[in-house]
């Protein structure tokens, strides 16, 4: 479902924190509706509760209105194990922090980040995910 078709879901939301979830590292980016751009932040190199504590610090620092999580799919759109892991991560964020969490198809974000010469592919992927989300807003 396109966010343009349901503008009430994002009404009043201005700032976002986005995540490119990985088993060992999670890319992070910040962005806003006004500029519709994203800025990479330091990648979180932690798992489990340590990852969530690091995210909590980022949320306190940036005070986003909502979160965005990239969800990986196979090129044909089929889900796989990492799809389910990222969706679980998304649910954990929603439950733990009480913020709206939007899921974005992140196919090819890492490939695009690497092709762009990103020094931190995870953070660059989070930027790509967030900018894709921001462009989809009405």
From Swiss-Prot:
GO terms for cellular component: cytosol. It holds the Pfam family RuvX. It is an enzyme of class 3 (hydrolase). Its main location: cytoplasm. One of its GO terms (biological process) is rRNA 5'-end processing. GO terms for molecular function: nuclease activity. Keywords: Cytoplasm, Hydrolase, Nuclease, Ribosome biogenesis. It is found in: Cytoplasm. Its EC number is 3.1.-.-. SMART domains: YqgFc. HAMAP family: Nuclease_YqgF. Belongs to the YqgF nuclease family. Could be a nuclease involved in processing of the 5'-end of pre-16S rRNA. PANTHER family: POLYNUCLEOTIDYL TRANSFERASE, RIBONUCLEASE H-LIKE SUPERFAMILY PROTEIN (PTHR33317:SF4). This is Putative pre-16S rRNA nuclease. The lineage of its organism: Bacteria, Pseudomonadati, Pseudomonadota, Betaproteobacteria, Burkholderiales.
């Amino acid at each position: 479902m396109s966010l343009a078709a349901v503008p009430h879901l994002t009404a009043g939301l201005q700032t976002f924190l986005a995540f490119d979830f990985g088993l060992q590292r999670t890319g992070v980016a910040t962005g806003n509706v006004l500029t519709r751009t994203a800025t990479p932040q330091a990648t979180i190199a932690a798992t489990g509760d340590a990852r969530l504590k690091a995210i909590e610090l980022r949320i306190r620092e940036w005070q986003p209105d909502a979160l965005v999580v990239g969800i990986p799919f196979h090129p044909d759109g089929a889900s796989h194990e990492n799809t389910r892991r990222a969706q679980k991560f998304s649910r954990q964020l929603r439950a733990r922090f009480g913020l709206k969490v939007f899921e974005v198809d992140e196919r090819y974000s890492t490939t695009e980040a690497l092709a762009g010469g990103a020094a931190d592919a995870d953070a660059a992927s989070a930027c790509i995910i967030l900018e894709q989300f921001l462009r989809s807003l009405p």
